[in-house]
Amino acid sequence: MKFENVQNSDKTLLVTGATGRQGGAVIRHMLAKEWKLRALTRDQGSYGAQQLVGRGVELVQGDLEDPGSVERATRGIYGVFSVQDFWAVGARREMQQGKNLADAAKKTGVEHFVYSSVGGAERNSGIDHWESKWEVEKRIRKLGLPATILRPVAFMENYYIDQVEIGILKGKLMDPIRADKKYQTIADDDIGEFAALAFERPEEFIGQELELAGSELTNPETAAQ
């Protein structure tokens, strides 16, 4: 199959998690490149959703656990950015949400499906947070979707989780990782930039599985910065 570069495209992307960290980063980068964007939201009247409207993003009402609404949301679009929140819904529901979106993309002929998984998803860890995303990856491959799988490591923004940030403000970096252990992190914005790059250069990125990391430091090295 031959793919053409789609820079400065007038094609539309569906972004899930658009009011969240990863989806929001994708929105920022794709708007800067003048793409047309559609955001799936359960509540079109929410503050976050209305902020998107003000930036020119089309809203479509739907729920990732409702296959019918997901299929409607994917009609007539070029690409999908797929991300689900394990911490909000748990492993079983996260898997179903991811599979529902992949199934809908297959039915409606989506041309590029970018899925945000997790670093090490393929390593049979037995940990729910990893295994749930691996199951979604397997569905994407089984369907034969033209896909790019991004596997980001831990988020730099986790340092702003309440308990961690409080410790930092008191001069302590509270983290269970050993002090001599190198620890990979990545910023949400970098994930958005990689997703944007994948959508603009499908000939390079479709069929790729990419682990994403922005830094590799010990906690003392991080604290020193």
Give the predicted meaning of each segment:
Residues 62:
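Cofactor-binding loops of NAD(P)H-dependent oxidoreductases
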Residues 2-51, 65-68, 72-77, 85-99, ...:
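Oxidoreductase cofactor-interface core, primarily capturing Rossmann-like NAD(P)-dependent enzymes
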Residues 56-58, 147:
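Short, conserved active-site loop motifs that form the nucleotide-linked donor/cofactor pocket
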